[in-house]
Amino acid sequence: MQKARIRLTGTDYEKVETVCTRIREIAERTGVNMAGPIPLPTKRLIVPIRKSPDGEGTATWDRWQMRVHKRLIDLDADERALRQLMRIQVPKDISIEIVLEN
């Protein structure tokens, strides 16, 4: 049987977790085997910016960061489960990638 590998990425971990719980509910309702959600390492994108625009005075810095959270879910590729997966309301700042594997 084919497996569907679902990769979720987003900057807000709470939204990523809500999408994971929706996928888990679909797997329980349809009765397919599910592995995950497996938390992958969080990427931290850090941008240091100089506070003073003119370069005079002491060098003080602001550090801005954005964290990218990732989750990996494997489940059996049942037709009913995949149809319900396509109808999930996914927030705009979360990307979802589904790959079918043998």
UniProtKB/Swiss-Prot annotation:
Pfam families xref list: Ribosomal_S10 (PF00338)
Keywords: Ribonucleoprotein, Ribosomal protein
GO biological process, one term: translation
One GO CC annotation: small ribosomal subunit
Entries under HAMAP family matching the protein: Ribosomal_uS10
Family, as annotated: Belongs to the universal ribosomal protein uS10 family.
Subunit architecture: Part of the 30S ribosomal subunit.
PANTHER family xrefs: 30S RIBOSOMAL PROTEIN S10 FAMILY MEMBER
Protein name in UniProt: Small ribosomal subunit protein uS10
Species this chain originates from: Methanocorpusculum labreanum (strain ATCC 43576 / DSM 4855 / Z)
